[in-house]
Amino acid sequence: MPYITDMLRDRNSAATPPAEERSEPVPVGAFDARRLSKALSSKIVGQQAAVDAVVRAISIAHVGATDPTRPLANILLVGPTGVGKTELVRRVAAELRSGPDDLCRIDMNALAQEHYAASFSGAPPGYAGSKESFTLFDKNTVEGDPYTPGIVLFDEVEKADPTVLRALLQVLDNGELRLANGQQKISFRNSYVFLTSNLGSAAVAERRRSHLRQLADRVRIDRPRHGHHLVQRALEKFFDPEFFNRIDETVILDEFDDQTAEQVTRLEIELITTRLARRGIDVEVDDSAVALLQRRGFDPVYGARGLRRTIRNVLADPVAGAVLDLRPVGTQPLALQARAVGDQIQVKKAP
């Protein structure tokens, strides 16, 4: 019987397959910035500058160039509603951890009043719950492990009470949150901390409405640059310098243009058709239906916020009716075609 060392020697001496034949995924602990950028760009369309900024921040942290007493990166994502801020963080979690929902997400709307601050850092000594050290954070998800960094998302950070924002300073600067009982702490030093904000959205929306009014006069304005200026000014006005200066990367996401809106619409349709394909239902959605969903699902001011609802009501509803009519029982394959007829989508059996 061969010794274990001989077995390992034989295994290590085997020919290494060429790079093009090596199988995905990337080994544990490895990092490929180009692969991450490609994966994020395939899901977050129209925001290449934001994707590049996030990948750059993660790359700097991965090589160990960051301060070990702080989080791996403090990244602030800012932009109008419905442009993919939260979805970008979910896609990062999908690539760095086990899935898009494998992150610690804190909705700062729930901390809008001062007396809710206890749920952020725990109850102080002498108050009910101080011994339990209850907080909103999942310690295992936040602290991660040597090969899997944590992902923490503070969603709509501007909605939190100033008391919570002051407590957040120690997370951004010291990389840890000391609980109010003074006996325990949670480390964020192996985590990427993301913050999202809608600051400046009102000004951007008003500028967008003004731009739509000016189209008739053919008045051309530089939309991305002007929008970034409005958002940056809103950030500097709202956040104190000591908070804003603790952010490593401020990423401003752009509004969607027509081409990006079409790409996002097709991605959302693909999610529906993929789910149906697993059940043996093949749905072909033609260009007229895509254009209808894009027109009804996108708002010039609020972006893609209502797109999923539109796809559910305008596409998924007639598809469900056709499936129940054509395949009431059984699991035999079914092919359907969806096309726009007027302001509705007609679904029928494919020839």
UniProtKB/Swiss-Prot annotation:
Gene Ontology terms, MF aspect: ATP binding; ATP hydrolysis activity
Top-rank lineage group of the source organism: Bacteria
Residues at which ATP binds: G79, P80, T81, G82, V83, G84, K85, T86
Annotated region described as Disordered, given as residue ranges: 1-26
InterPro entries in UniProt: AAA+_ATPase, ATPase_AAA_core, Clp_ATPase_C, ClpA/B, ClpA_ClpB, P-loop_NTPase
SUPFAM superfamilies for this protein: P-loop containing nucleoside triphosphate hydrolases
Record keywords: ATP-binding, Chaperone, Nucleotide-binding
Protein's recorded name: ATP-dependent protease ATP-binding subunit-like protein
